[in-house]
Structure formats: structure tokens, C-alpha cells
């Protein structure tokens, strides 16, 4: 198969969307021998970003977008829209926006394979990866760990973070995810949140709040409110069962699968 060069746009530098673009470039080359070129400028063939932003700047091509916010902008008739979750697809369709396909964000296959860990005894505590934004509810989570802060590993740009969100390597991030008993997922809104699925990919179950945010991909222990964190109890056998189930569910989000779906749009 010959090289096929396409421009793929990221709406920002040093952000989650650029991470998605970089992962897509790497894995499309690895699995499909397809060369994609990152750009910060339009026009492009393929746009990655927040739906409201992309709909305002892209007039044709393909938008692979998500958003934690209400959709307030409509795309041009020439722009084909791919989104990252069934919930977002349904939300857009209610706004009169046609969605071509649902393709979730992919995880880092290589790191997941390297760090997958089903050993209950090699794990302790809880982990969360989140930007310091109100809807991420970091302060609420920290409050639940008052008096037992050492049990929580917080990866964030929050002032009380254990590791900085922006400087942590992929290798260290996946190592930390694979040595926690649970990943805490309590955000009020997401387009498609990658870190919880990254946790699942190394065998770490989620403790997640009962919201549309996690309905589609959540795996682990569902709770009604963040206060229920205080009530979590689980045996070794129950945890091991959840660990395997969550790992298995995460396979749908590996780039070997996601990339095959994207290939049809890049070819």
C-alpha cells in the first residue's frame, strides 16, 4: 500500500486534542502505513477538536469532534461530522445535525499492553486524571479523602496534584494507572473522556458516578453520588472479576480497532 498524505488539524497546542492527533498520526502509520501530517492551520482534510469550535472554522472536510458543552453551532452542509459517543450523536441529532458515524477516541495500545496488570496485591489506593475545571469536581473528590489523602493519586494541574497533568510521560501515566485499585470518574460532563478508558485498558476498574458521561463505556462500580465513595468495599475475587471485564471492554478503544474505522475516512 502506498503512502497517502493527508492534513489533520488540531485546534490547540499542548492540549488533549493535540494528543489525539499525535496518537492518530502514529497509529495510522503503524497499522495502515498511512502518512498524516499535523497542522494548526486550516483548511485541512480532517479536523479534531471541540464541536462548537470546529463547526465555526471548518467549511468542508471531516470533523471528528466532541464537547462537554451544549452544541450551539451548526456545521456547514459540506462538513461531514463524526463524533465520539452515542450520547453526543443523539444530542446533535436533536439539534438537527446529521452525524455520519460514532468513533471514540483511541488509547495508546503500546502502553496498555506494556502495563496491563491483573494482580490485586500489586495495587493500592485510587487514581484520577483531570484538568482543574469546575465540572471535573476535583475539589469534591479531595474532600472525600480528607484524613486519608495518601490513598489518592491526583494527576492534574490542580494546586494539590501529586503529578503535573502536562509533564507526565505516557509511560509513567500508564504505570500509575496500572497500580491503583480503582480509577475515580466523577466528572459532570464529557465529550469522550480518555483517561477512564486508559485505566480500564490496564485492568483498573472505574468507580464512576451515575451520569450519561459514563453510561456508554463505564465499567466497574457505579454510584449515585460522589459521597458514595466512602461506602466502597470489595473482595479480592470481586475486584479481579471487574478488572478483567473492564480490560476486555477497553479493547474496543484500542487504535487497532479505532484506526480501522478512521481509515475509511482518510483513504
Curated annotation (Swiss-Prot):
Its EC number is 2.4.-.-. Keywords: Glycosyltransferase, Transferase. It comes from the Viruses. GO terms for molecular function: glycosyltransferase activity. Belongs to the glycosyltransferase group 1 family. Glycosyltransferase 4 subfamily. This is Putative glycosyltransferase 63. It comes from Sulfolobus islandicus filamentous virus (isolate Iceland/Hveragerdi) (SIFV).
Amino acid at each position: 500500500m502506498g503512502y497517502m498524505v493527508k492534513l489533520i488539524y488540531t485546534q490547540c497546542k499542548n492540549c488533549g486534542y493535540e494528543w489525539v492527533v499525535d496518537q492518530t498520526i502514529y497509529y495510522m502509520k503503524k497499522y495502515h502505513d498511512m502518512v498524516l501530517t499535523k497542522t494548526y492551520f486550516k483548511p485541512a482534510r480532517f479536523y479534531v477538536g471541540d464541536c462548537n469550535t470546529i463547526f465555526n472554522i471548518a467549511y468542508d472536510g471531516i470533523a471528528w469532534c466532541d464537547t462537554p458543552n451544549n452544541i450551539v453551532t451548526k456545521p456547514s452542509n459540506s462538513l461531514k461530522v463524526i463524533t465520539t459517543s452515542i450520547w453526543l450523536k443523539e444530542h446533535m441529532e436533536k439539534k438537527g445535525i446529521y452525524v455520519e458515524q460514532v468513533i471514540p477516541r483511541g488509547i495508546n495500545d503500546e502502553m496498555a499492553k506494556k502495563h496491563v496488570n491483573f494482580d490485586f496485591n500489586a495495587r493500592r489506593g485510587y487514581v484520577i486524571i483531570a484538568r482543574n475545571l469546575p465540572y471535573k469536581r476535583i475539589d469534591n473528590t479531595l474532600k472525600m479523602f480528607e484524613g486519608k489523602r495518601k490513598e489518592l493519586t491526583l494527576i492534574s494541574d490542580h494546586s494539590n496534584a501529586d503529578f503535573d497533568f502536562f509533564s507526565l510521560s505516557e509511560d509513567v501515566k500508564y504505570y500509575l494507572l496500572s497500580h491503583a485499585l480503582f480509577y475515580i470518574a466523577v466528572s459532570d460532563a464529557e465529550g469522550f473522556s480518555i483517561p477512564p478508558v486508559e485505566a480500564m485498558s490496564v485492568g483498573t476498574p472505574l468507580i464512576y458516578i451515575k451520569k450519561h458521561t459514563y453510561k456508554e463505556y463505564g465499567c466497574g462500580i457505579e454510584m449515585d453520588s460522589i459521597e458514595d465513595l466512602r461506602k466502597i468495599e470489595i473482595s479480592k475475587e470481586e475486584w479481579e472479576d471487574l478488572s478483567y471485564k473492564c480490560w476486555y471492554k477497553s479493547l474496543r478503544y484500542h487504535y487497532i480497532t479505532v484506526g480501522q474505522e478512521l481509515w475509511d475516512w482518510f483513504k
